[in-house]
């Protein structure tokens, strides 16, 4: 086992914290860039992704028995999520919002973990940063030609954030529990 001096350990923690913070900023830049696209470009990107996913999904679902059962479940889910029924377009956009903020919250949590911040503060800071950025992003998007700003997007963003932070909380609590249990002597 490699033992590092406290000074070297601090430098390594700072370096990793800085690298993860850069990843957070990079993901925020990607979100900002996607929100900066005008309505037509954004719609085209979503339509292209939608077609790729639909082709892949339909090919799998038509060729296997499990796929046919999965098709029924997914169709029910899409109808429950989307008031328009089979609205792949909106569902894919919601999944994109959810996923981006899921990973942003995860990166923030990891950054704060490496920096040595307590578990509760990691959750609070990650949640506040994601909420603030989601609100800023929707405000910014409202000023882009052909785009609208909706609180529904902020809600989906926060669902991704809360799911990520919930999983982080559970995993860190489980790891803390494992560390605190005395090990049996052999």
Name every feature range the model reports, one short phrase each.
Residues 145:
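Short beta-strand-loop-alpha-helix junction that forms the active-site gateway
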Residues 2-142, 151, 158-186:
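Bulky hydrophobic segments
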């Amino acid at each position: 086992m490699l033992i590092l001096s406290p000074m070297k350990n601090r430098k390594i923690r700072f370096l990793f914290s800085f690298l993860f913070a850069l990843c957070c900023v990079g993901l925020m830049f990607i979100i900002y860039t996607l929100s900066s696209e005008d309505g037509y470009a954004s719609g085209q990107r979503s339509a292209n992704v939608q077609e790729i996913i639909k082709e892949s999904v339909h090919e799998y679902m038509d060729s296997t028995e499990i796929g046919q059962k999965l098709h029924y479940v997914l169709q029910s889910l899409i109808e429950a999520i989307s008031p328009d029924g089979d609205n792949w377009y909106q569902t894919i956009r919601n999944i994109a919002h959810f996923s981006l903020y899921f990973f942003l919250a995860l990166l923030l949590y990891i950054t704060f973990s490496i920096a040595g911040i307590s578990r509760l503060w990691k959750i609070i800071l990650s949640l506040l940063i994601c909420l603030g950025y989601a609100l800023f992003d929707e405000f910014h998007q409202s000023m882009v030609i052909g785009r609208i700003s909706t609180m529904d997007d902020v809600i989906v963003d926060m669902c991704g954030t809360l799911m990520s932070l919930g999983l982080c909380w559970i995993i860190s609590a489980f790891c803390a529990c494992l560390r605190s249990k005395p090990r049996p002597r052999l």
